[in-house]
């Protein structure tokens, strides 16, 4: 029985990056031996155990053989005779197929993962890559994480991803898994690499067609020097990651704010009149299909519908600003206004040449919101107002507070 550290912990250590959870593989043991040593079985589909003291996951070395369509159709063999090399062969990428002996510290790298780390290449381990559609999503997610370190995807890996997209294999992806991977991407440093990897291999069209449809749709060059809406989508996602690191909530709203531009009739290009309204329906359909949590949906729909109003904030009347805050649910969910401001700033700065531009509308929106939020309905009730009178007086008082805050700014 031998124990090896495998996967991300080894990869990240070799990259000099902070390591997350540690995963271990056990060679030459069976389930009875593991339990006799105090390991607690937790794997439903695979022989996985928790260490009796550390609680870390230890899995028996295993092979997997494709037995059906999708990512669940596998036959697992965890016999004690399965070797370390056989276990590593089933893994997705060479950089994840590196093991380190727990006792000696010796590194085992049968598939060239160390070389690929040095050359900054994301490469699949073997032809079994095509058997699991989730690996296409994982490839794109790894690119979102590793692209800032200079990684590129191996041409042969991109070709396999394209083959999987063309074959219809990606249709078997469970929506919840797509959302799980997307949410992890939106907390990464460079979400654009996820989008670009999937788009270039044809996988984005199969997995997230609403996002893929934006590529090739032109915008007015005086407002969008990058022209292509798909490129703008990438730039906005990266800017959101820069402005709100690790905030997938803001990232999702930024990613989906312009879906309506894909619905503009080509004869109207490069203008996109009312795209902020047209984008709500495909956004809601996307959220429904992926079973996106409500807080993500609500902020995304708000940003889609209102981002142009925030851009035009200096032109809006005080009453219109109050109506905007109400539509954004800014009085019941105060945090939403700061989130919306970040999304809109990412939109404005996610354009070629505007990356370092100022966006005064963001702080201004939060300032007038704070002024209006300071008006309390309980104070009005204490003045003897009742029922609808309180609502009317509250709106009037908040509009006056907005006006005062704006006048002080001027």
From Swiss-Prot:
Subunit and partners: Monomer. Can also form homodimers and oligomers.
GO BP: RNA repair; tRNA 3'-terminal CCA addition; tRNA surveillance
Binding site residues for Mg(2+): 21, 23
Family: Belongs to the tRNA nucleotidyltransferase/poly(A) polymerase family. Bacterial CCA-adding enzyme type 1 subfamily.
Annotated residues for binding of ATP: 8, 11, 91, 138, 141
Protein name, per record: Multifunctional CCA protein
An example Gene Ontology molecular-function term: CCACCA tRNA nucleotidyltransferase activity
Purpose: Catalyzes the addition and repair of the essential 3'-terminal CCA sequence in tRNAs without using a nucleic acid template. Adds these three nucleotides in the order of C, C, and A to the tRNA nucleotide-73, using CTP and ATP as substrates and producing inorganic pyrophosphate. tRNA 3'-terminal CCA addition is required both for tRNA processing and repair. Also involved in tRNA surveillance by mediating tandem CCA addition to generate a CCACCA at the 3' terminus of unstable tRNAs. While stable tRNAs receive only 3'-terminal CCA, unstable tRNAs are marked with CCACCA and rapidly degraded.
Note on domains (UniProt): Comprises two domains: an N-terminal domain containing the nucleotidyltransferase activity and a C-terminal HD domain associated with both phosphodiesterase and phosphatase activities.
Cofactors demanded by this protein: Mg(2+); Ni(2+)
Residues that, per the record, bind CTP: 8, 11, 91, 138, 141
């Amino acid at each position: 029985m031998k124990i090896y550290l495998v996967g991300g912990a080894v990869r990240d250590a070799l990259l000099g990056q902070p390591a997350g959870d540690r995963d271990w593989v056990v060679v030459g043991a069976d389930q009875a031996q593991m339990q006799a040593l105090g390991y607690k079985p937790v794997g439903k589909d695979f022989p996985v155990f928790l260490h009796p003291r550390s609680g870390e996951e230890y899995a028996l070395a295993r092979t997997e053989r494709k037995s059906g369509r999708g990512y669940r159709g596998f036959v697992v063999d965890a016999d004690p005779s399965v070797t370390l090399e056989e276990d590593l062969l089933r893994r997705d990428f060479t950089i994840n197929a590196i093991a380190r002996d727990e006792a000696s510290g010796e590194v085992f790298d049968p598939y060239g993962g160390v070389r690929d780390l040095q050359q900054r290449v994301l490469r699949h381990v073997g032809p079994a890559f095509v058997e699991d559609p989730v690996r296409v999503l994982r490839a794109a997610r790894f690119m979102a994480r590793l692209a800032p370190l200079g990684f590129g995807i191996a041409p042969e890996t991109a070709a396999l991803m394209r083959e999987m997209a063309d074959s219809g294999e990606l249709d078997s992806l469970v929506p919840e898994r797509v959302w799980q991977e997307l949410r992890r991407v939106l907390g990464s440093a460079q979400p654009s690499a996820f989008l670009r990897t999937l788009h270039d291999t044809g996988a984005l069209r199969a997995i997230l067609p609403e996002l893929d449809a934006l590529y090739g749709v032109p915008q007015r060059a005086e407002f969008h020097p990058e022209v292509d809406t798909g490129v703008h989508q990438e730039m906005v996602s990266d800017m959101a990651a820069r402005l709100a690191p690790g905030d997938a909530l803001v990232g999702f709203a930024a990613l989906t704010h312009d879906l309506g531009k894909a619905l503009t009739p080509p004869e109207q290009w490069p203008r996109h009149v009312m795209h902020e309204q047209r984008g709500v329906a495909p956004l809601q359909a996307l959220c429904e299909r992926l079973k996106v949590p409500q807080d993500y949906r609500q902020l995304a729909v708000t940003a889609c519908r209102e981002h142009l109003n925030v851009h035009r904030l200096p032109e809006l009347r005080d009453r219109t600003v109050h109506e905007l805050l109400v539509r954004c649910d800014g009085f019941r969910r105060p945090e939403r206004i700061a989130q919306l401001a970040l999304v809109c700033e990412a939109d404005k700065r996610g354009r070629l040449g505007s990356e370092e531009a100022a966006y005064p509308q963001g702080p201004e929106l939060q300032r007038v919101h704070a002024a209006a939020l300071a008006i309390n309905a309980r104070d009005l009730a204490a003045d003897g107002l009742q029922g609808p009178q309180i609502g009317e007086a509250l709106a009037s008082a908040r509009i006056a507070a907005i006006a005062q805050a704006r006048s002080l700014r001027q």
